[in-house]
Amino acid sequence: MAGLLVAGTSSDAGKSLLVTGLCRAVARRGIRVAPYKAQNMSNNSMVVADPDGHAGEIGRAQWLQARAARVTPTVDMNPVLLKPSSDRRSHVVLRGLPYGTLEAGEYAHGRGPLIEASRAAYEALDEAYDLVVCEGAGSPAEINLRAGDYVNMGLARHFGLPVALVGDIDRGGMLAAVFGTWGLLEEADRTLLAGYLVNKFRGDVEVLRPGLETLTQRTGLPCLGVVPWLDGVWLDSEDTLRVGTPAPTVRDAGPRLSIAVVRLPRVSNATDIDALAAEPGVDLTVTTRPDLLAAADLVLVPGSRSTLGDLSWLRATGIADVLADRAAADRPILGICGGYQALGRTIADPDGVEASGAPGTTALIEGLGLLPVHTLFHAEKSLGRPTGTWRGHAVTGYEIHHGVADVDDDAERFLDGARAGAVFGTMWHGTMEDDAFREAFLTEVAALSGAAWRPDPAAPGFDARREAMIDTLADAVEEHTPALLDLALSRVG
């Protein structure tokens, strides 16, 4: 098999970043390379094509890695996607399509089809590409999960893949984490370890070298590179709303526009904020504080994995009252997908997609009543890549939802959704990544809020910034981890 696995000593060790940079570095050499993550757990996903050309879901990181590899993203690059709807329950997406739900206790005996699908997806990629760069999940040293593992060492052993182990030194304890991981692995798994990498290092590498030499002596593992801390680098968010990432490189001194994003407990597809955070002159915060939400020029209510649960939370926290006051004062609000549904008048869930109780027994639920919209949940999920226009600007987005919004006939339209005064709503994710649309919408927001902000015509577009970030990662791989790059190139089939 023409592949390798990048595993981590923990979650957020930097696996996704390194795989992104490695894919671009390999692609620069004219090699057809594909990313792969057997199982991802995230409520932030992207709509791509399945093998039959139909729409399907994968994690945002694998979508970005496919862009880095300069190939079309497919559902095989993330065949199993778990989308948590509670602490003990996840919606399962299998090769891009809804598969069902799994409770925490059901996972151990219900993962057989997931393993089968993930292996079939890897084999399809291995046949279609010269190299497959795999990303692990969590840590391979979770020995309590080893028996059924198909994401880390289980994947590596099944396909005979060498493993590069990544540790995050910025958190502290990286040397111990690498040594502990090595020590906990079975001997057959240890033999697959090709070496380790240090990620997010600040300072003089010579200070670190004695520790690396000792670690190599005790484990026999070579150091494949030391990646420095990289400013201005981000990844499309996997699980949480992150404040101000990516932020503008230089804070300009001109007029400002403030955006407050509601930190919903069950937020999904939070990447809608990334392009807003990168816009010059925009100050973006993610918050639950009513005073900050009341004061902002724009409030964004993002997508939700549990619209009904988050609607109840909005009321319980008093944020619903803040939104009502803003609407009454013609102060801008934007709702996206679940946030849009919550801003509407009613939500019906006869199939029990979100509401508890037997299907068909759920009563009509009142929304916040700020938009002339009525939402009906369907058991079947809607996936798509819609296009439209607003104020003469072509707009492309993507949609992932069970709720179908019915807009009143006499309502003012906003993309696929509605506008009432200064309240806007749409089911479409990803629209803010379109530079012309984002700038036009924020200009409208500034006019409504009385802000003097205007877009900077000289600023780089969001897509250009993302490409520059990918190239920064690839440059770091080439400069600081040549041994990792050599390992990858040696696996080209």
For each feature predicted by the language model, list its residue ranges:
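Non-catalytic terminal/interface segments that mediate subunit docking, oligomerization
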Residues: 298, 355-356
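Short glycine-enriched nucleophile-adjacent loop
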Residues: 344-345
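Flexible phosphate-sensing "switch/lid" loops adjacent to ATP/NTP-binding sites
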Residues: 1-325, 332, 349, 379-380, ...
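Conserved P-loop NTPase catalytic core
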Residues: 353-354, 360-384
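Catalytic nucleophile serine of serine hydrolases
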Residues: 337
